[in-house]
């Protein structure tokens, strides 16, 4: 962002997610794996609501990049503390039933993202879910898209659990492009994608 090469440049106070999305970074969660009173520069940390009803409210800023961006440090030298997506209002089971065919991703492989444009492409494995029922495993597939589009097509389940320093409930992402071997044929189609983090 400070170099002007991020797809999130100049996006503060703009809607980048769907309006149901709220994202927090809370350094004071009791027994949180990322909890801390001060960041790596000794700046006191505080709770940040990074995304408020889909609107980007803050960047993660330390003193060095704060000067470059003309922003005050928000105690994020070294990155996030306890970052999480607020849970949604739909149950996990009902989320799987929202669409007739859903690809449930359990693992991503590799890293192929362009943070300038927001384009990305990663290998993945998971399961095909039909009408809420897990049918068969899938592997050697590639999921691709653009973060700008993906962020606005997320629906969150209500199954948020705090297991790591970054946490999210199961999320349904609509309109992803999937390519790979599908049983004996090749699939190249838009499907609904569920990520379990």
Explain the meaning of each model-derived region.
Residues 1-8:
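Active-site pocket-lining segments that scaffold enzyme catalytic pockets across diverse folds
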């Amino acid at each position: 962002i400070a170099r002007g090469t991020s797809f999130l440049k100049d996006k503060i106070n703009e809607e980048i997610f769907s309006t149901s999305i709220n994202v927090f970074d809370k350094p004071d969660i009791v027994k949180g794996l990322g909890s801390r009173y001060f960041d790596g520069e000794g700046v006191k940390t505080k709770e940040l609501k990074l995304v408020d009803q889909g609107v980007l409210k803050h960047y993660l800023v330390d003193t060095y990049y704060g000067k470059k961006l003309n922003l005050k440090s928000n105690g994020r030298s070294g990155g996030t503390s306890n970052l999480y997506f607020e849970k949604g209002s739909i149950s996990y089971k009902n989320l799987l039933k929202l669409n007739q065919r859903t690809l449930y991703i359990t693992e991503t492989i590799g890293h192929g993202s362009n943070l300038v444009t927001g384009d990305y492409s990663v290998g993945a494995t998971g399961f095909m879910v039909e009408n809420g029922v897990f049918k068969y495993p899938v592997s050697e597939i590639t999921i691709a898209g653009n973060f700008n589009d993906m962020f606005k097509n997320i629906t969150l389940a209500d199954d948020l659990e705090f297991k790591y320093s970054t946490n999210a409930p199961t999320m349904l992402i609509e309109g992803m492009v999937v390519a790979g071997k599908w049983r004996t044929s090749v699939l190249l189609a838009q499907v609904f994608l569920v990520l379990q983090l």
